[in-house]
Each structure stands twice: as structure tokens, then as C-alpha cells.
């Protein structure tokens, strides 16, 4: 399975609210440390980052579902397109969703060894990013949240 890598720096999401949710594709090899991908930032360290939340994986498979959801409800286009990295993930791929992944599963990512540590608990920043007031709750109810990972062995990873 091919995994895409993303990283971001803190920027203003809305007036007075800084977030590193705006991730960009990584096109060259990067080091994966116990704190996450080198060059990636977390702004709210109370809720993001740390050894058990070093990386965030979101299944690319889900983006079509979100587009269908938006269309079915007749909602206007979101502020951010439904595409990988839109939910602030560091890792995304096709073929691995919540239906196959379990807490404790271990994966080799390049030279790094990573482990699923917990489900992602989406927050209000998604509502701001997409312009839909209840998006984080819809995400939780749909079960399409992705998950967080810890890094067991540091190493170089490449897109």
C-alpha cells in the first residue's frame, strides 16, 4: 500500500485561532522521530502531539464519502476541498480504514516502526476549516475519524 506523507506549520485558521491543520505533501525523504515527522508542528499541545499522538493517519478512502455526504445534504462547497491532508493528517492511503485497523497494530513505514495508539477524536477546528458547524460531530458519529500513532523506532521515511 502506498502512503502519502504530509506536514504543516502553525498558521491562523480563523482570527485568534492558530492551527497546524494546513498540511502540505512531503515530496522528499524525511525523518520520523518519536515526536512525529520532522518539520511538522502541533500548536495545541494539550490535545495534539506527544508520544501517543506523534502521527495522524486518515484513510483517503473516506474522502468520497464526505463529498457524497455534502452533496446529499445539499450543502455548499466546503472551504477546504475533500482531498488527502484536508483533515490535518500526516499519513493517508487507500485500503486501510477503521474496519481493518486496530489499536496496537504495528506497521513498518520506511525505516520507522509505528503503532496505532488511539482513535482520533476530531475537534471544533474541523468545523472552522470546512465551514460546517457540526462536522466534528458528524465525523464521530460516522466512525470515519482515522487514528493516532506512536513511533516505536525512529527512521527515515519517503513518500
Regions flagged by a language model, labelled:
Residues 1-128, 134-135:
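Electropositive, beta-rich accessory/interaction domains or terminal extensions
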Residues 133-150:
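A mid-sequence, solvent-exposed acidic-amphipathic segment
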Residues 149-159:
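Well-ordered alpha/beta subsegment
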